[in-house]
């Protein structure tokens, strides 16, 4: 018997989740839910339905786990509690400062529906956090550093695009080279997460 999975949101994350499901024989993609016209969404999995988000409640007893693939800025704070009342849910909410608030909202909704809500299990927080935990367990007297970039931040870019009047936007994260070198040289500097920001039109 396979675990029936629903995907809500079919952008880069949703497509990646579909590929992961296809690699696990005990999982089956039941449906993808989208805000777009379902006729325009082409998925890889034969036999899986593509439905409008508005139709999700009709799948309440047909899906074991709903994986929410929206953005942390505005999608997941609303979607995860809403759908935790109907399904077991998983999200990758990554606004670190708001995780306790998000947990409280999802926990209450999941309990109301008799479901399980698992939040913030993307990369960071998520798999990357576990890697850091393992390293700290093995080297308890060590000092760990986290550098992001060089690269595009999907979450920050999503937040930028949701600002009224912004047609498109990308946020690039570039670590401070002097900080990288200090760590590489074994200087164990005290660093903060504050960085400089610039905008280019």
Where are the regions that the model predicts?
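Extreme N-terminal starter segment of soluble prokaryotic enzymes
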Residues: 1-5
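Active-site-lining helix/loop region of Rossmann-like oxidoreductase modules
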Residues: 8, 16, 136-201
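Hydrophobic/small residue at the entry helix of a nucleotide-binding pocket
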Residues: 13
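NAD(P)-binding Rossmann-fold cofactor-contacting core
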Residues: 23-45
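Rossmann-fold NAD(P) dinucleotide-binding segment
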Residues: 56-61, 65, 73-92
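General beta-strand structural signal in soluble alpha/beta enzymes
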Residues: 91-92, 117-121, 147, 170-171
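Rossmann-fold NAD(P)-binding glycine/threonine-rich loop
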Residues: 93-117
């Amino acid at each position: 018997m396979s675990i029936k999975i629903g995907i809500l949101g079919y952008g880069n994350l949703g497509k990646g989740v579909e590929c992961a499901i296809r690699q696990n024989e005990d999982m089956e993609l039941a449906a993808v839910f989208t805000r777009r016209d379902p006729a325009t969404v082409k998925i890889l999995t034969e036999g899986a339905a593509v439905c409008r988000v508005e139709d999700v409640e009709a799948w309440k007893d047909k899906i074991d786990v709903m994986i929410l693939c929206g953005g942390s800025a505005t999608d997941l704070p609303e979607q995860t509690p809403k759908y935790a009342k109907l399904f077991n849910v998983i999200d990758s909410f990554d606004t670190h400062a708001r995780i306790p608030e998000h947990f409280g909202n999802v926990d209450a909704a999941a309990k109301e529906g008799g479901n399980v809500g698992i939040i913030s299990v993307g990369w960071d927080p998520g798999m990357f956090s576990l890697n850091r935990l393992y390293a700290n367990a093995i080297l308890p007297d060590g000092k760990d550093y986290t550098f992001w970039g060089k690269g595009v931040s999907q979450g920050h870019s999503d937040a930028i695009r949701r600002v009224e009047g912004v047609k498109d936007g990308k946020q690039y994260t570039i670590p401070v080279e002097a900080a990288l070198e200090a760590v590489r040289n074994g200087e164990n500097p005290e660093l903060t997460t504050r960085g400089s920001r610039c905008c280019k039109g």
